[in-house]
Regions:
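Short Pro/Gly-enriched beta-strand edge/turn motifs at strand-loop
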Residues: 73, 113-118
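Extended, charge-rich low-complexity interaction segments
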Residues: 105-115
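Short alpha-helix plus adjacent loop in nuclease-associated cores
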Residues: 79-91
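Domain-level recognition of soluble alpha/beta enzyme cores
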Residues: 119-145
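Glycine-rich phosphate-binding loop signature in dinucleotide/nucleotide-binding domains
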Residues: 41-44, 93-97
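Short, solvent-exposed aromatic-acidic interface loops
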Residues: 147-152
Length: 152
């Protein structure tokens, strides 16, 4: 299974709630840059999951403009403070497909630590508009291999 972890770009600080915060103009430019780099990697992506937060949905739209065959499903399992073990279960349920997750920190950083190192305590960090490609033969903590990181 291939898993692409995508953190949204830099978000605007002005909004009524955290969920409503959209991308700043710099975040939009970052997303466009990293999606172009992802396209050059010819990824095999069959399904997408996106956080219901506005900035993640905007990032998923940027991905869809380049990869129109990817259908995204909105899920609260990947909101910023979600439990990475719940995300691991989501991946296990979809292990017959290569997926992209468009989400936030800290859940993405915790997830990459869990998949690659077997613990969320390893303190890996994912920057804005970064894309990580992970490969897993078995969907379980500690079995993920980080193949590459794309930055804007």
């Amino acid at each position: 299974m291939l898993v692409y972890l995508v953190r949204h770009g830099i978000a605007d600080r002005r909004a009524s709630t955290d969920q409503e915060r959209g991308l700043a103009s710099e975040g939009i430019a970052q997303n466009q840059s990293v999606v172009k780099k992802l396209y050059l990697q010819s990824p095999l992506i069959e399904k997408g999951f996106v956080s219901p937060f506005e900035r993640a949905k905007q990032t998923a739209i940027d991905i869809c403009l380049t990869f129109p065959d990817i259908e995204f499903e909105e899920t609260a399992l990947i909101i910023p403070d979600a439990d990475p073990y719940d995300v691991l279960n989501l991946l296990e349920e979809n292990q017959d497909q290569n997926v992209v997750l468009v989400s936030h920190n800290p859940v993405l950083s915790d997830l990459v630590s869990l998949l690659a190192d077997g613990t969320i305590k390893s303190n890996r960090q994912i920057g804005p508009s970064n894309v990580l490609r992970m490969m897993m033969d078995i969907v379980a903590h500690g079995y993920g291999q980080l193949k590459y990181i794309l930055e804007p």
